[in-house]
Amino acid sequence: MLVVDSSVWIDFFNDADHPSVELLDQLLAHGEVRIVVPDLVLFEVLRGFRLESELRQARRLLESLSIEPAGGEELALAAVQHYRSLRAQGFTVRSGIDVLVAAYCIENDYALLHRDRDFD
């Protein structure tokens, strides 16, 4: 299973020319990999649309995939541990949501497609 981070979805909906967007296009066209959309990613992606028509179109596509809840106490505590470990190693994570998404992928053994240096 694969989680696609908001960094890729945003580029996808903006028709950006990038290998991660091309890969997502192929995955959506062929349906060979189950794409999971954590609710946190759903929020990050949909909050950026200005036009209602674009929001509806994006929502339809994302809701056609597997939307899963990504919150809860257990995940939050796992994310705290990951965050603290990264800080102890000298890494600064810019987004708390990115830590939650990463913890969600780790806890569920999901791959992550991203364009965000927080995940590197």
Which functions belong to the PLM regions below?
Residues 67-115:
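Active-site neighborhoods of divalent-metal-dependent phosphate/nucleic-acid chemistry enzymes
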Residues 6, 39, 97-99:
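Conserved glycosyltransferase catalytic-site signature
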Residues 9-10, 42, 119:
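A generic structural signal for short hydrophobic patches within well-formed alpha-helices
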Residues 11, 45, 87-89:
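Short, contiguous strand/loop micro-motifs
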Residues 1-37, 47-60:
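Short, well-structured N-terminal submotif of metal-dependent ribonuclease cores
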Residues 21, 42, 55-58, 76-80:
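A general structural signal for well-ordered alpha-helical segments in protein cores
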Residues 44-48, 66:
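Helix-loop "lid/cap" segments that line or gate small-molecule binding pockets
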